[in-house]
Amino acid sequence: MRKIIIAIVALTVLLGACSDKSAFDLEVGDCFDDPSSFEEVESVPIKECADPHDNEVYANSTMSGTSWPGVAAVEEFADEACYTEFERYVGIAYEDSLLEFGWLVPTEASWAEVDDRTVTCIVYNLDLSKMTGSMQGVAF
């Protein structure tokens, strides 16, 4: 039960025929299409990065603390963590890129029920078109 928050623009919801992976198990380099809903994401349709896809995981950052910090604090952590990791993965500063970033973050329920502290950073095309190939080191 992860909630996706998208910086600047909302992603278009597209479905694809592929295998699903738990949102809790996403790893750097995983490529996937948009889930059917971004409210609370439990799984995403995984794609081969060589095939057209909507998103790619470029970082996972772990929040600390035992008490739920609130939505604003989670979003602030996600924005800072994903911004910081963007250039390391893509190879160009976010401000100079044609790519956008967003994130999957813990919900209050997942924080309490399954000890979810992971913020998953994702990259996607600013124009919401499909990407082909990994975005690692593309520098655009």
Predicted regions and their residues:
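Primary mode marks residue(s) on the alpha4-beta5-alpha5 output face of response regulator receiver
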Residues: 18-140
